[in-house]
Regions:
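ATP-dependent carboxylate-activation loops
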Residues: 146-167
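Active-site nucleotide/adenylate-binding loops and adjacent lid/helix of ATP-dependent enzymes
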Residues: 1-58, 69-73, 99-111, 115
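Pocket-edge structural micro-motifs
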Residues: 19, 32, 54, 78-81, ...
Length: 202
C-alpha cells in the first residue's frame, strides 16, 4: 500500500491502475480522487502487480495488430478501431462492444507499431498493441503478445480473406511462403446475454 501512495504522490490524480497481466479492462481501476484510491486498496489482493499510469481523457482507441515470424519479421499487420473504450464498456453495461478493421492505416501508426514490435524483439507470436489516438498523434497504452480478444481473429480473417491461425501454423513449422492479403473493412458487434434487442442475430 505504501507503493500505491508513492505512485499517487509522484504521478498525481487522476490515474489508471492496471494489472500487469490481463485482457481488456478487467480488474482495471480509474482513480479520480482519494476515495477511489482507498477503494482500490481495499479491493487489491496484495499480490497482483499493478501499473499506475496518468489517466488520458480520450475516447479514441486504435490498435496495431499482427504476427511476427521466427526471425522477428512482421508477416502481416492490421488495425482495429474501437467504437467504445474497454474501460467505458467495463463501467457502463448499457454499451455493446463494437469495433472495425481499418483498411487504410495511418503511416504514423504503422511506424509506431513497427518500432514497438522491434523494441520487444518477440518471435513467432501474434501482437496486439493499443494506442490512444489524439488529434495529430498517438499515445501507447499497452503491448500484448497475443491477438486481440473475443472475435478479433474472425474479423481479421473476414476482412483479409484468409485464415490467420493457418498462417501462424505455417510460420511456426517453417512452411510460410508469404501472404497475399485482400484488404477490406471488417466489423464486429457483440451482444450482452442479459439484454433484449429489437432485432435478432438473423
Amino acid at each position: 500500500e505504501g507503493d500505491i501512495e508513492k505512485g499517487v504522490k509522484k504521478l498525481k490524480l487522476p490515474l489508471i491502475a492496471k494489472p500487469d497481466n490481463g485482457v481488456g479492462a478487467s480488474a482495471t481501476y480509474k482513480l479520480k480522487d482519494k476515495k477511489d484510491v482507498e477503494n482500490f486498496k481495499k479491493e487489491w489482493d496484495g499480490t497482483t502487480h499493478y501499473f499506475l499510469e496518468p489517466f488520458v481523457d480520450n475516447s479514441d482507441i486504435v490498435t496495431f495488430d499482427g504476427l511476427v515470424d521466427a526471425k522477428g519479421n512482421i508477416v502481416f499487420y492490421t488495425s482495429i478501431v474501437y467504437y467504445h473504450t474497454p474501460l467505458d464498456l467495463l463501467n457502463n453495461n448499457t454499451l455493446d462492444w463494437v469495433y472495425y478493421i481499418d483498411k487504410d492505416l495511418d503511416p504514423k501508426l504503422v511506424e509506431y507499431g513497427k518500432n514497438s514490435v522491434k523494441a520487444f524483439g518477440m518471435k513467432e507470436r501474434f501482437f496486439h498493441i493499443e494506442f490512444f489516438k489524439t488529434k495529430d498523434d498517438y499515445i501507447a497504452i499497452e503491448y500484448n503478445n497475443r491477438p486481440a480478444g473475443a472475435f478479433a481473429v474472425d474479423v481479421y480473417n473476414f476482412a483479409h480473406s484468409t485464415d490467420y491461425f493457418r498462417v501462424y501454423a505455417e510460420v511456426a513449422n517453417g512452411t510460410f511462403n508469404g501472404l497475399n492479403v485482400d484488404e477490406k473493412y471488417g466489423l464486429a458487434s457483440t451482444r450482452r446475454d442479459y439484454k433484449d434487442y429489437v432485432h435478432s442475430d438473423e
